[in-house]
Amino acid sequence: MTSQRSLSSPQTRRPSVMGLISLVGSIVLLFLLIFRASTWACLFCFTTYEERLRVCQLFVGREETKINLCRNELEGAFEDLKDMKINYDERSYLHDEFTQMTVSLQEKAARRREPFWLAFKDAAAKLKRTIEHLKKAPACIPPCGLQEVARLFHCSGCFSKLCDLPLDCPVQDMLVNRGDQALFSCIVAFELPESEITYSWKFVGGVRTKDVTYFRDMPGAHGYLARIRPVQPKHGGTFSCVILHDQRPLARLYFYLNVTGPPPPEDTELQVTFREVMNRTPAEPEMIQPWSPSLGELLTNPQALTLGNLFLLAATAALGSASVTLLVWLFFRWYLSGN
């Protein structure tokens, strides 16, 4: 048997090589387009495709080649604004500035007094100065918290981002003697919104943890301060304070309370008696009733013959004598009138 070996000529290999080069070139071009769009994206974040196209049409007409050249010049003029990060609260103001820039370029195109590349360069320089004078966002303050005031808008991808910090703060250890006072302050170093701030307190006894599943609510605590007085061993454990803005958590603080100190000495018998007297419920007070002695009690009880009682006895005797005299006189008068 004879074996045949097929040999490929350079002409047959050339199409496959050319196809590979074309594929690599397409991929490189795609990466360049993506990189370019992400590099000068401030222009793309605050203007629309239709707005940019309209500007170039007013400058160069509707010929596609000239429009592509104009668009490249417009995008290239904003190269200095690559990777810009601005205060998120200034985003609306910057959008208005880009809108005003677009209107200004359209007016320049209508007057046809300067070439488009010069107009684009001047517009980009003005916007760069505007961005540099925007109010800066405060820096992130570690170690924790959802810090809205530090939110930044990234032109590189037209998105906003918060500080890369956890919501949970580190546990603060507190060593308090038995019988003393424990004071917890739910305060963070970063700026909080001015309104709709609430505080929620939770507690888990006996452990040092940040696992929220173990905690139970403390309905009696609502403000940013919490106090325990006097501290007892049952208060040992982890206290958690959640700062909320419109029911959205901004930070969770943890306080581990370690109660130390010996138990109080046993009370003496005198201290026990004194505490019982102090805690005893007062009895009903006795009402003093006035005493009005009778005539027999005045005569039989020598202690009752006070000055007032003697006067009362004399008055009674005089009244009795006068009554008897009057009765005798009335009787004699009746008797004599009958005779």
Curated annotation (Swiss-Prot):
Extracellular side: 42-310
Motif position, CXXC motif: 42-45, 155-158
Disruption phenotype: Male infertility. Testis appearance, size and weight are normal and there is no effect on sperm morphology or motility but there is a failure of sperm-egg interaction and fusion. Spermatozoa undergo normal acrosomal reaction and can penetrate the zona pellucida but accumulate in the perivitelline space as they are unable to fuse with the egg plasma membrane to complete fertilization. No effect on amount or localization of sperm-egg fusion protein IZUMO1.
Role description: Sperm protein required for fusion of sperm with the egg membrane during fertilization. May regulate the expression of sperm surface protein DCST2.
Membrane topology designation: Single-pass type I membrane protein
Organismal lineage: Eukaryota, Metazoa, Chordata, Craniata, Vertebrata
Signal peptide: 1-41
Tissue-specific expression: Highly expressed in testis. Minor expression also detected in epididymis, seminal vesicle and ovary. Predominantly expressed in testicular germ cells during spermiogenesis. Most abundant in round spermatids and detected at lower levels in elongating spermatids.
Protein known as: Sperm acrosome membrane-associated protein 6
Domain Ig-like: 166-251
Free-text comment about domains: The extracellular domain shows strong structural similarity with IZUMO1 but does not interact with the IZUMO1 receptor IZUMO1R/JUNO.
Alphabetical keyword list: Cytoplasmic vesicle, Disulfide bond, Fertilization, Glycoprotein, Immunoglobulin domain, Membrane, Signal, Transmembrane, Transmembrane helix
Intervals, Cytoplasmic compartment: 332-339
One GO MF term: protein-macromolecule adaptor activity
Transmembrane annotation, as ranges: 311-331
Native source organism of the sequence: Mus musculus (Mouse)
Glycosylation sites: N258
Superkingdom: Eukaryota
Family membership: Belongs to the SPACA6 family.
